[in-house]
């Protein structure tokens, strides 16, 4: 392990050691304890100087669209739950609950919190099924009572800690729960007890391949892939597993298969070859990780897979060509893994602009069947699925200097940066307003390239960015403080035209989920720990409060005993993002005394 990677690892051990419920494998236990105390001091300093949350809304005077929203449909029986990562398999994130609405949201308050006891990169997208709320940390899966936040059960796993300790959530199907691990496995658990039922290896941790994504499940299958596309030699694959046994039903290579690659199950048919990868000698085809969840069209049995960056991330001269299927949404037959089509959004990527979240599949007010997706390049893309043509590409955060090539002899500044744009959470779609809501990060990066010799010297299985830095916190490029440092954007964009109606700027980036409801609200949070309820029609803030640590995971809403509640994952701590050091918690909010649908 090189010194830079070890430094990052020590910091992550520090973030995850010595707290209630902790349990990293701890050969560095003493060292980590020291670093943890330093981390707590860092958190206190950040808390002292962190500004209060603030938002400002701007209306587009050129917007032409529907003057009034469509009438709300009555809640369906399924509205009581949030059964999948993005609620529906098609990922719209819309809830038809309206008990909490524009008229009473001012009375919203935190009712209870569940403390995981961990300092971790808390990105879990909770699910709510059969009266229990399920969440994950890097090492744990837990079930809590959504009425009281009392723990039903918690199952802890032991394996070596990863550079950034992340897990994005679990899937549910027929009494079983499923999650990935940072040592390359998929695990299944009994929903009621948390007992482990099976495990299947789908990635090679020695190569840098990990499984942080939230799976989805449908018709006896569990769909999940591996991340690790920033590590030399690592490749992305997509899998379907048998939900009862864990057996691999099919495997699909998201970048070309070459000699020596591991085949773990039957392969889905693919047209992919090496023609779009003209790599220089000694540079292995690398990248294409699928590090976030996926989307499924159950009517047509199609799986939509977002695919990450090629590597080395910042030097595309090492790998001339479009580098398929990186920077794409790949559509597969969900039953067989056979290739159907793809949409490449970021060809020849040199900014680390992954397609970083599941696309949403919607029927617009104008009668279109649309795929909308918002990757890290800072745009919202809308594709008409009738002919697969691009309808619009709308900027939804600051875009600057996006075309300048990177160089060995100078710094190049660009926006959005490598952790900018829309990250691992999907947009949300509100059928009542016909708006797509995107939550984005406005944060720039400065890059200077390594020499070709330095890039070639990187060992297999080590980070392979191509960027010249000795700061472990800048592994994804040097983040800029010179231009206002950072912000967040929430855009409301017409699903038919791609024109934005209103946009809201937050003084903290928006990494967490965006959730619209039939109550006329949009819920979101920022990495300042501020949680907001926004009027979906106008963009005006109706309620806001700091509810804990940085918000970068799920925001879901559901009912318990006829009462609507909202659950938020708070306490995101990452060596790449300067947030307050607070333990990971689930906050459950509601309005006391409100019961029944309205």
Region roles according to the model:
Residues 358-396, 402-404, 409-423, 536:
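Phosphate/diphosphate-binding loops
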Residues 37, 43-116, 150-159, 195-204, ...:
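Aromatic (tryptophan-biased) beta-strands that constitute blades/sheets of beta-rich domains
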Residues 556-598:
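Blade-level signature of beta-propeller repeat domains, shared across WD40, Kelch, NHL, RCC1
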Residues 9-20:
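Bacterial N-terminal signal peptides
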Residues 233-237, 326, 379-381, 446-451, ...:
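Structural motif
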Residues 82-86, 119-140, 162-186, 210-231, ...:
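Repeat-blade elements of multi-bladed beta-propeller folds
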């Amino acid at each position: 392990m090189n010194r830079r990677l070890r430094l990052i690892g020590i910091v992550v051990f520090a973030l995850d050691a010595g707290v209630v419920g902790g349990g990293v494998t701890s050969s560095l236990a003493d060292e980590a304890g020291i670093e943890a105390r330093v981390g707590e001091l860092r958190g206190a300093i950040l808390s002292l100087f962190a500004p209060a949350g603030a938002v400002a809304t701007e209306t587009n005077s050129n917007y032409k669209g529907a003057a009034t929203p469509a009438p709300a449909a009555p809640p369906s029986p399924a509205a009581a739950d949030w059964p999948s990562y993005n609620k529906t398999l098609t990922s719209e994130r819309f809830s038809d609950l309206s008990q909490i609405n524009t008229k009473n949201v001012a009375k919203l308050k935190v009712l209870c919190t569940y403390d995981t006891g961990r300092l971790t990169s808390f990105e879990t997208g909770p699910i709510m099924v059969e009266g229990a709320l399920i969440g994950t940390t890097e090492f744990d899966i837990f079930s809590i009572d959504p009425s009281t936040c009392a723990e039903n059960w918690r199952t802890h796993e032991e394996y070596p800690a990863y550079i950034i300790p992340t897990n994005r959530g679990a899937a549910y199907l027929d009494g079983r729960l499923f999650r990935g691990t940072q040592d390359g496995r998929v695990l299944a658990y009994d929903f009621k007890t948390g007992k482990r039922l099976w495990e299947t290896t789908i990635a090679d941790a020695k190569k840098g391949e990990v499984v942080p994504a939230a799976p989805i499940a449908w018709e006896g299958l569990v769909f999940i892939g591996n991340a690790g596309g920033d590590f030399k030699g690592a490749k992305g694959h997509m899998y379907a597993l048998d939900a009862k046994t864990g057996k691999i039903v099919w495997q699909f290579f998201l970048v070309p298969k070459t000699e020596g690659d591991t085949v773990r199950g039957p392969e889905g048919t693919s047209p992919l070859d090496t023609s779009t990868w003209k790599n220089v000698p000694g540079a292995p085809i690398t990248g294409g990780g699928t590090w976030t969840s996926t989307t499924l069209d159950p009517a047509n049995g199609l799986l939509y897979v977002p695919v990450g960056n090629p590597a080395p991330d910042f030097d595309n001269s090492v790998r001339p060509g479009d580098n398929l299927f990186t920077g794409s949404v790949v559509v597969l037959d969900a039953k067989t893994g056979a290739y159907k089509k793809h949409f490449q959004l970021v060809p020849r990527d040199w900014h680390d602009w992954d397609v970083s979240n599941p696309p949403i599949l919607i029927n617009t007010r104008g009668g279109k069947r649309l795929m909308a997706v918002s990757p890290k390049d800072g745009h919202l893309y809308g594709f008409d699925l009738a002919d697969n043509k691009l309808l619009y590409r709308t900027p939804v955060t600051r875009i600057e200097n996006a075309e300048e090539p990177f160089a060995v002899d100078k710094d190049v500044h660009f926006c959005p940066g490598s952790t900018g744009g829309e990250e691992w959470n999907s947009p949300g779609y509100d059928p009542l307003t016909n708006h797509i809501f995107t939550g984005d990060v406005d944060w720039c990066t400065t890059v200077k390239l390594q020499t070709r010799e330095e890039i070639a010297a990187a060992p297999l299985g080590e980070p392979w960015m191509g960027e010249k830095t000795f700061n472990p916190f800048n592994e994804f490029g040097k983040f800029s403080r010179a231009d206002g440092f950072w912000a967040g954007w929430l855009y409301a964009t017409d699903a038919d035209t791609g024109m934005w109606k209103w946009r809201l700027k937050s003084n903290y980036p928006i990494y967490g989920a965006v959730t619209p409801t039939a109550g006329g609200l949009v819920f979101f949070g920022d990495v300042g720990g501020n949680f907001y309820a926004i009027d979906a029609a106008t963009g005006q803030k109706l309620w806001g409060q700091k509810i804990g640590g940085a918000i970068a995971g799920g925001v879901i809403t559901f009912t318990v005993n006829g009462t609507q509640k909202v659950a938020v994952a708070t306490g995101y701590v990452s060596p790449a993002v300067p947030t307050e050091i607070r333990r990971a918690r689930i906050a459950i909010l509601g309005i006391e005394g409100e019961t029944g649908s309205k």
